[in-house]
Amino acid sequence: MVSETKTTEAPTLRRELKARHLTMIAIGGSIGTGLFVASGATISQAGPGGALLSYILIGLMVYFLMTSLGELAAFMPVSGSFATYGQNYVEEGFGFALGWNYWYNWAVTIAVDLVASQLVMSYWFPDTPGWIWSALFLGIMFLLNWISVRGFGEAEYWFSLIKVATVIIFIIVGVMMIVGIFKGSQPTGWSNWGIADAPFAGGFSAMIGVAMIVGFSFQGTELIGIAAGESEDPEKNIPRAVRQVFWRILLFYVFAILIISLIIPYTDPSLLRNDVKDISVSPFTLVFQHAGLLSAAAVMNAVILTAVLSAGNSGMYASTRMLYTLACDGKAPRIFSKLSRGGVPRNALYATTVIAGLCFLTSMFGNQTVYLWLLNTSGMTGFIAWLGIAISHYRFRRGYVKQGHDLNNLPYRSGFFPLGPIFAFVLCLIITLGQNYEAFLADTIDWGAVTATYIGIPLFLIIWFGYKLTKGTRFVRYSEMDFPERFK
C-alpha cells in the first residue's frame, strides 16, 4: 500500500508525532467510554469474577497482538498499518477488506463516543436535548484533526495524561475504601464476591456474552500502528510504546475492574444494564459517591467527558488516515487522497465526520438502545481487525525466516512467536463466533440483536471476496513477499 515517506513536491503526511505523543497514545489511547461508561455492564452481567477473568484473558490477548503489531510497525511504519501488512503478507483483497473494516470501525466508534457524551452531560443538564452536545463535541474533534497531526498529538497527549492521572487516583481511593482506611468508610474486603450468584454469575456463557464489551474497552490500543506513519524515529519509539502495553492492561483495566467489583455489588441497579434507563452515571462516579466525595463525583464525570473526547479524537484520526491510505492505493475515491499544505487529509476527514454525524439519530430512537447497538457493532469489527493483525504477523515472520533473513535485523522482535499470534487468533475467533450464541437457542430469535452483533462478519467477507473475485487476486506466497532491509 502507500508509502507516506517518499519525497515529492506534493504535500505528504508529516512525521511530527514525538516520542511523548506515541507513548501517551499507547498508554491512554484506549482508555475511554469502554472502561469509564460500559465497564459496569460486564460486572452486572457476568459477576465480579467473570468480568475480571474476561478482562485478564482479553488483556493478555491484546498484549500479544501489540507485540505482533509492534514488530510489523517498527519494520514498516506506514499509516495503512495492518491493512498494508494484510495486503503485503496475506492477500490483496484481505488488506482491502481490513482497511475498509477499520475505517467503518472507528467511524462507528466516534458515533458511540458522541452518544456517551450525551449521557455524561445529562448528569448536569438532564433537560437539554442530547443532540446539542453531540454537535458541539463533534465540532471539537473535527477541529483538532483539521489543524495538523501535531494538533491531534498534543490534544491526545493531554487528554491521556488527565485519564491516566484519574485512574491512578481512582485506584488509590478504591484501595483505601476496600481496606477501610478512607475517612468514614468501612472495609468492604471481598464480601461482594460472595453475594447471590457471585463471583461467576451466569457462568461461561455470561463471560462470552460480555467479551465483546470488554473488547470494545481495549479498542484503540492498536492506534500506535496507525500513528507509526507520522511518528519521529519509529524504529525506536514504537518498541518503547509497545512495552508500555502490559503495565497499562494490568494497572488501568484489571485493577480498576477489581476495585469496582469489590466496592459495588454486581446486583446494584446503578450499574449499566439493559433494563436501566439512566446510564449517565458511570461505575467510576459511583465509587466516589460511595466514598462520600460528592464533589469529586462531579469532577469524575468531567474526566469521563475528557475521555470521551479523547476516544473520539483518536477515532477521527485513525479513520481519516485509513481512508486516506485506501484512496492513495486506488482502493477508495482519489478525492480522499488529497492533503492540505500541512499534510492533513482533509477530504477524508470531511467524509468521516459526516458518517459520525449519524449519532444524531440517537435522539430519535433513545440513547440506551442505540448506544448498546453501536457498541456491539463496533466491538465486532474491532475483533476482525485484531484477527487481521495476528494473521499478518504470523505470515510476515514465516516469510521473513523462509527467505533467509536474520531476525536480529528486525528493529523490534516479538518474543512470543508463534504462541502469541496463535493464542490471539484462536481467542479472537472463539469470542467473535460465540458472541450472542444464546440468541439462537431461544424460542423466538431476536433478529435485531443478532444482526447488531454479527453484521461485521458478513460485511467483511463480502468486501474481501468481492474484491478478490473482481480483481482475481491470490494469497501472497512466502517466496514473493517483499522485505526491504530498511523502510524509510
Language-model region placement:
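Membrane-interface loop-to-helix entry segments
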Residues: 131-189, 219, 242-246, 250, ...
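Membrane-interface "cap" regions at the ends of multi-pass membrane proteins
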Residues: 1-40, 44-49, 63-67, 79, ...
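Helix-loop-helix junctions that connect adjacent transmembrane segments
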Residues: 7-13, 52, 125, 129, ...
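C-terminal membrane-solvent junction of multi-pass transporters and transport-like membrane proteins
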Residues: 158-159, 336-343, 386-452, 481-485
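Helix-loop-helix connectors at the membrane interface of multi-pass transporters/channels
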Residues: 9, 83-93, 114-134, 166, ...
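Extracellular loop-to-transmembrane helix junctions
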Residues: 13-14, 38-137, 141-143, 248, ...
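TM-loop-TM module centered on a large, flexible mid-protein loop between adjacent transmembrane helices
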Residues: 84, 91, 123, 197, ...
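Membrane-helix boundary/coupling elements in multi-pass transport proteins
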Residues: 78, 101-116, 213, 218-231, ...
